């Protein structure tokens, strides 16, 4: 009742069956019926009812599916009613041989017998992996310490499964008031047809429902009172909208800085992200990119919140993220790649763009470049790549931490920020790179949860010595082109020739410019990105003369780079 009320629905009726009662007598010919605590004999009755009454739907608990899986399979196999039996789960498909889920892959390796691939066995395996991970962190294992670990960490990720948030409620709650989803996230709705065949689509994409419920009480309004209130709310609408605007004005400078690293003596782990070839994508898909980038921003921000990290800033489609925990940072980067892989982008044009770009690069090159993804078998490609590709760089170290009175937030400067940005900028789309400082900041138990490949020493611009870099294999099986070490990296390289320019060139120097200068540079990018080099030079001249910024008269490949950089600083 609480769930239905929260989402604005009503419970038409409820029936408590006694032993010997048949569930079939109470199933309606249409609508949704939720059955709790069914018995084996109910399964055949439900199958027959759903097969005959195509407008009826029956929702059962996942625990019933798991415990009585063989009976459900026997009853619903090859039945039209399978599409109308529904349940919710956060598990990936236990029998998907083409899975992208690391949990299922490990499960299949541990349990090679296909007949043992059931939801209950996968649930047990995932639980075992969770306990294995937690016990590695404990010198002494007791029930209190184990439960405390969940609440202390809030979010826990094992392979590709995330658990949490676990929040220890204040005070003592009665059983009637306590509500829990036991830490499940990314809950999707399946039909029994999908349980039988992994290629069947889910009915509801994964979501993490709110745990804030509207609790009914004895003083609830009657329908007549609600009708009267409906008339009244029109009179209040204008007042409410004005109040909303007023509150927004008050709160617009408010920023949540709770998760921002603030201690100068504590190492900070910085993450930089960037969408590969976003400038060219905007030029070729201007009608699709706004929604795609908005989805990208929303997903990244949800991960920042999930892992208690801090959004420092965004420039274009690049994120700078600060983390108190290197483990949380690496978890965030890994889940980012997995979520983008699983996301339904609603189009294939981004994948087609990357394929065409790689093929064009191969044709125009000297024959040494081999497209890493363009020539993959379509089925293999689908398991490894999907939609926009985001590169990620991670580095850990001490920072110059400053509070900005304008943005009301914290910013991070110095060599740590520069190294993190440079690490991201040499990567490829879909690739996650971390420095040895980040890797060695992880405990042995934490490292065991990630698949990494050492890449050796990598020269980074602005860093005196080559940096040991590790590749996080967030999506096993992906291959990448060589690191982009030949890139000329400066804040305004995006004004250089070529269609592969992207805002990573900004992210690589975020730590070197102020917030205002960055905003000016982004605006100039948007205005001048489609101009030729000569047109840019001519457009910049009046601004430079007005603001007394030195501007070289001769047009050369790097002319506007230095000019616009100086102009951005002068105008801030």
Swiss-Prot record:
First-level EC class: lyase
Membrane-spanning residues: 226-251
EC number assigned by the record: 4.6.1.1
Residues binding Mg(2+), per UniProt: 274, 317
Biological-process GO terms, alphabetical: cAMP biosynthetic process; intracellular signal transduction
Membrane topology according to the record: Multi-pass membrane protein
Keywords attached to this entry: ATP-binding, cAMP biosynthesis, Cell membrane, Glycoprotein, Lyase, Magnesium, Membrane, Metal-binding, Nucleotide-binding, Receptor, Transmembrane, Transmembrane helix
Record: glycosylation sites: 10, 77, 152
Ranges per topology, Cytoplasmic: 252-572
Subcellular location(s) of the protein: Cell membrane
Reported cofactor(s): Mg(2+)
Alphabetized InterPro entries for the sequence: A/G_cyclase, Adenylyl/Guanylyl_Cyclase_3/4, Nucleotide_cyclase
Ranges where the Guanylate cyclase domain occurs: 269-424
Cofactor, free-text remark: Binds 1 Mg(2+) ion per subunit.
A GO term for molecular function: metal ion binding
GO CC aspect terms: plasma membrane
Extracellular face of the membrane: 1-225
Catalyzed reactions: ATP = 3',5'-cyclic AMP + diphosphate
Pfam families on file: Guanylate_cyc, Peripla_BP_A-cyclase
The family this protein is said to belong to: Belongs to the adenylyl cyclase class-3 family.
Function of the protein: Could act as a receptor for an unknown ligand.
Protein name according to UniProt: Receptor-type adenylate cyclase GRESAG 4.2
Species in which this protein is naturally found: Trypanosoma brucei brucei
Lineage, top ranks: Eukaryota, Discoba, Euglenozoa, Kinetoplastea, Metakinetoplastina
């Amino acid at each position: 009742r609480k769930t239905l009320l929260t989402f604005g629905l009503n419970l038409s009726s409820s029936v408590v069956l006694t032993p010997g009662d048949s569930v079939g007598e109470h199933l309606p010919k249409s609508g949704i019926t939720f059955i709790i605590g069914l018995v084996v004999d109910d399964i055949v009755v439900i199958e027959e009812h759903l097969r005959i009454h195509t407008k009826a739907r029956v929702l059962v608990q996942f625990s019933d599916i798991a415990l009585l899986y063989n009976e459900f399979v026997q009853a619903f196999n090859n039945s039209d009613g399978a599409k109308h039996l529904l349940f919710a789960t956060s598990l990936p498909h236990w029998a998907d041989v083409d899975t992208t889920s690391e949990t299922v892959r490990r499960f299949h390796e541990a349990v090679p017998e296909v007949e043992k691939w059931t939801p209950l066995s996968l649930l047990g395996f995932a639980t075992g992996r969770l306990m294995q991970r937690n016990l590695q962190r404990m010198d002494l294992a007791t029930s209190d310490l184990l439960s405390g670990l969940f609440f202390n960490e809030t979010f826990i990720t094992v392979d590709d499964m995330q658990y949490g948030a676990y929040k220890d409620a204040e005070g003592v709650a009665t059983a009637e008031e306590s509500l829990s989803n036991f830490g499940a996230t990314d809950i999707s709705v399946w039909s029994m047809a999908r349980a039988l065949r992994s290629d069947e689509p889910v009915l509801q994409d994964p979501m993490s429902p709110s745990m804030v419920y509207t609790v009914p009480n004895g003083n609830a309004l009657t329908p007549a009172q609600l009708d009267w209130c409906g008339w009244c709310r029109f009179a209040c609408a204008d007042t409410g909208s004005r109040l909303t605007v007023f509150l927004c004005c008050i709160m617009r400078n408010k920023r949540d800085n709770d998760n921002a690293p603030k201690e100068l003596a504590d190492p900070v782990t910085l993450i930089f992200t960037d969408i590969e070839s976003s400038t060219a994508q905007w030029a070729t898909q201007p009608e699709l990119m706004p929604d795609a980038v908005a989805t990208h921003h929303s997903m990244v921000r949800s991960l920042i919140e999930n892992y208690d990290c801090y959004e420092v800033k965004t420039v274009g489609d690049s994120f700078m993220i600060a983390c108190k925990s290197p483990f949380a940072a690496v978890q965030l980067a890994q889940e980012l790649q997995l979520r983008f892989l699983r996301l339904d982008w609603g189009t294939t044009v981004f994948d087609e763009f990357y394929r065409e770009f790689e093929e064009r690069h191969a044709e125009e090159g000297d024959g040494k470049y081999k497209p890493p993804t363009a020539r993959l078998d379509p089925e293999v490609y689908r398991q490894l790549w999907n939609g926009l590709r985001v590169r990620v760089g991670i580095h850990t170290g001490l920072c110059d931490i400053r509070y900005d009175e304008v943005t009301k937030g914290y910013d991070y400067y110095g060599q740590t920020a520069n190294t993190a940005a440079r690490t991201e900028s040499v990567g490829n789309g879909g690739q996650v790179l971390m420095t040895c400082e980040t890797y060695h900041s992880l405990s042995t138990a934490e490292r065991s949860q990630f698949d990494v490949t050492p890449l050796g020493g990598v020269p980074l611009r602005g860093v005196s010595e080559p940096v040991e870099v590790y590749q996080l294999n967030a999506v096993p099986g992906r291959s990448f082109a060589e690191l982009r070490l030949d890139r000329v990296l400066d804040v305004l390289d995006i004004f250089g020739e070529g269609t592969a320019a992207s805002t990573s060139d900004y992210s690589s120097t975020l730590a070197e410019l102020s917030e205002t200068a960055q905003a000016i540079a982004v605006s100039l990018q948007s205005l001048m990105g489609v101009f030729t080099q000569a047109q840019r030079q001519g457009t910049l001249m009046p601004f430079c003369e007005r603001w007394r910024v030195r501007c070289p008269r001769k047009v050369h490949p790097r002319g506007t780079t230095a000019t616009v950089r100086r102009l951005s600083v002068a105008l801030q």
